[in-house]
Curated annotation (Swiss-Prot):
Location of the protein in the cell: Cell inner membrane
One Pfam family cited in the UniProt record for this chain: SecG
GTP-binding as UniProt keyword: no
Name this polypeptide is given: Protein-export membrane protein SecG
Ranges that cross the membrane: 2-22, 51-71
Length: 115
């Protein structure tokens, strides 16, 4: 589920950037090719400005809502084990404790005194 949310988040971000770039600016840039200046276009005499503005607002709202949802999921995600590689620190501590128990006791003489 988390990966699906991230994928949707990235797709919405890319589409928002695309919609912002094709909107008609002061110089009628790329937005004019989508019906910004002609009345016989697919969007009608109003042009693409109204449609593109509404779509941008809708996707921006979805982007912010998805940000909150991903933040909420991510904050609760750390409490749940997902797979066998999630808790490697506990496994490392168990191995170190087992090595301390299994290690033979080596009698060491005072190594500070030269022989």
């Amino acid at each position: 589920m988390y990966q699906t949310l991230l994928l949707g988040y990235a797709i919405i971000a890319i589409v928002i950037v695309f919609l912002i770039l094709i909107q008609q600016g002061k110089g009628a840039d790329a937005g004019a090719s989508f019906g910004g200046g002609a009345s016989g276009t697919i969007f009608g005499s109003v042009g693409s400005g109204n449609f593109l503005s509404k779509m941008t607002a809708l996707l921006a709202t979805a982007f912010f809502v998805m940000s909150i949802v991903i933040g909420n999921v991510n904050s609760h995600r750390n409490n749940v084990k997902q797979g066998k590689f999630d808790d490697l620190s506990a496994t490392a501590e168990q191995i170190q404790q087992q090595q301390k128990i299994d290690a033979p006791a080596v009698e060491t003489k005072n190594s500070d005194i030269p022989q």
